[in-house]
Regions:
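Signature of the chorismate-utilizing enzyme
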Residues: 1-213
């Protein structure tokens, strides 16, 4: 029997090095190098190979420890793309090690795979109950009143939330909730902030003149 590899996540750690460090010592035969004016970038190893359209979500999924905090620090994707799109979309690489000298500062970023088991939260609840805060009749009444107000021109749009109360024998892990929402609601915007977790099918913005909020 072949064991299933443990799931992993990627973690990137960036640390500053002295300028004058030979950036190209990081470069390997199958690596990447970019030198222009005062900027030097060298990379080696591959932790992910991604299509251009997947670069942003791939980088955003990496846990980052980056005290440098400037453009180009932290994890990056590198590579070359075909000039003629008929030759294929091309692919970019997230390297295992990147050394950068931007003309003012120099740093090294290392990316490693970390077993998910090392960062998982507590065991999920073994028992829980879900109880609607409103009865079926109360919910129908809310819908009817909303439709009536729309019909009278008092509202153009209304979003009704049906509250439920969930009680469990142990705390829920926000990470587990987010993971399940991503799996069960693939077309939604999944979010979590300070214990407020959810999935929305739409992203709402409001424009005031030239400002969007």
């Amino acid at each position: 029997m072949t064991a299933t590899p443990a799931p992993v996540r990627l973690r990137a750690v960036t640390h500053e090095v002295e300028r004058g460090h030979d950036v190209l010592t990081t470069f390997s035969a199958d690596g990447f190098a970019w030198v222009h004016a005062g900027t030097r970038i060298a990379a080696s190893g591959v932790v992910a190979r991604v299509a251009p359209r997947d670069v942003t979500p791939t980088l955003e999924a990496i846990e980052v420890d980056d005290p440098i905090g400037v453009v180009g620090s932290g994890p990056i994707a590198v590579g070359g793309l075909p000039f003629d799109a008929r030759r294929g979309p091309g692919a970019l690489v997230v390297p295992a090690r990147v050394t950068v000298d931007n003309g003012e500062r120099a740093w090294v970023t290392d990316i490693e795979a970390v077993p998910v088991a090392a960062v998982t939260g507590p065991e999920p609840p073994s028992r829980f109950s879900v109880v609607p805060a409103q009865s079926r009749d109360e919910w129908r009444d809310m819908v009817s009143r909303a439709l009536a107000r729309i019909g009278h021109g008092q509202l153009e749009k209304v979003v009704l939330a049906r509250e439920v109360v969930i009680e469990a024998d142990s705390p829920f892990s926000p990470r587990e909730v987010v993971t399940r929402l991503i799996s069960q609601q693939p077309g939604c915007f999944v979010y979590a902030t300070e214990g407020f977790v959810g999935a929305s099918p739409e992203l709402l913005v409001r424009r005031k003149g030239h400002d969007v909020e």
